[in-house]
Structure formats: structure tokens, C-alpha cells
């Protein structure tokens, strides 16, 4: 099944919904970083959150960066997303291994850690980026984003993020949704939606059964005048390039660049997001040094 993000409303616009299937996207990201099952679940949830939140941006020049930095063994996850639903991610320790939690599930909360901060950084093309931050609540990621939307953006929200890892470490199913109540929405409506969300099977179960994202939303919002507004195709996409790496090398400063050049060795730079390797000969380092003067 192809990955897909949809934006929708229910109850005459009183409910805003962003939902998607992200199985292939998450599989690509976890394969790049060679993740263990619990690392795949954590990175996959962050990538899914990123692509969903990215679709709320107004223009292609805007960027949202999500960071969850807890005290667990994963050592933090950073995700960057754009309005076209493209996303890339970096995980501090993709090799973390933990026993299952008390529910028999992958212990994402333990791997992330509960002592830390969730950051949402939006670069909207203004002089300074918008930075929202909240304390990590559970480390399970979905609950942390729900708390962020309610506490930092004053928008009561339900967030579900799921990743099902297969025995061969590939991603069997991944997806999620963000459901937000708009100002003026009936409290009873919020209670009904909360009840339905608690009663449905995990989103990864529904995806594994072959249900489309539209069918999943129709199941949740039956009788609530669901309207799908548009759809996007999410993808794992890194925008690194040799030119950007050259600029990054120049930005480290002349003294450091001079030290690298004086070592008379070639330099290899590896992109944290896609593991692409960029090789620079000593002569090329010298050219960059001259250009920085």
C-alpha cells in the first residue's frame, strides 16, 4: 500500500484532522539508520509526527524541526519536515536494545526517557524561528505531542502514532493522526471523539488489515460529516548536497579549516540524515580555505 497523508474536517469544521499511512517512509528511514526494533518504533513515530505537522506549514520555504531529547539510551531524535510532507530524521543511538515493557510492547518511553524536553521549532521565514517546548510526559512520543499542542499551542488534541516492526526488522505498518478541536467546539463532541479513539484498534492493526487512511477516518468519524480536503504523498527525503557540505565546512572557521588542511589528509563528511558520504581531497580543502578568506 502506498503512503498517503490526508487533511480533513468533521462536524462542520469543528474538528481538524491530519492523518496518514507512513509505512514506506518509516521503513526507508529505519533502514538508512540500521535501527533496532525499539529504535525503529521511536524514529518511526517521530518521522510520522514530522510529516503530519509539516503539512500544516503554509509555504514550501517554511520548515519545522522536531526534537525529543530525553535521558534514555536513544540520546535524542531530530526530525525536519516540509509542507510537501517530505521528512528526514536523525537518531542519536539507533542500536539501543531494551526488554519489552510491562504491556509486552517495545519500550519506546524507556528508550527515550522521561526526563527531558520536546521541542517544536518552526522556521517561517521571519527573523527568528518560533520555538515551542514542553517537558517530556511519557517518552512514548504521541502523548508528548498531545501535551505540546494543548499546553504550548492551546489546541486540545488527540495524537496517535504507531509503528509495527516485523520479524525481519522491516516496517510492517506505520501511521498516525492528529485530531484537533477548533475554538467553539462542543465539549460533548470532544468526549465522543475521545471515546471512539480509545475504543478503536491500534492504527497499525488497521493498516495491517489493508484499510486505507480514508477508511480508517470514516470508521472513527462515522456520522460526523467527515470531509477529506486534500491528500499528499509523504516521503523520506534528504536535501543534503556537496554544495551544502562545502558551506558547512567553510562555516567552521578558518582556523579549524587550516588545521584540517595542515594534516595533509583527505576528509570524509557523512550526512547524519541519510548517511551519504562526501569525500574531499586535501587540495579541495585548500580551495575551500582560500574561498573563506
UniProtKB/Swiss-Prot annotation:
Post-translational modification: Under oxidizing conditions two disulfide bonds are formed involving the reactive cysteines. Under reducing conditions zinc is bound to the reactive cysteines and the protein is inactive.
InterPro entries, A to Z: Heat_shock_Hsp33, Heat_shock_Hsp33_C, Heat_shock_Hsp33_N
Gene name as annotated: hslO
Stated role: Redox regulated molecular chaperone. Protects both thermally unfolding and oxidatively damaged proteins from irreversible aggregation. Plays an important role in the bacterial defense system toward oxidative stress.
Similarity remark: Belongs to the HSP33 family.
Tree of life domain: Bacteria
Subcellular location: Cytoplasm
Protein name: 33 kDa chaperonin
An annotated GO cellular component: cytoplasm
GO MF annotation list: protein folding chaperone; unfolded protein binding
Keywords: Chaperone, Cytoplasm, Disulfide bond, Redox-active center, Zinc
SS bond partners: 238-240, 271-274
GO biological process: protein refolding
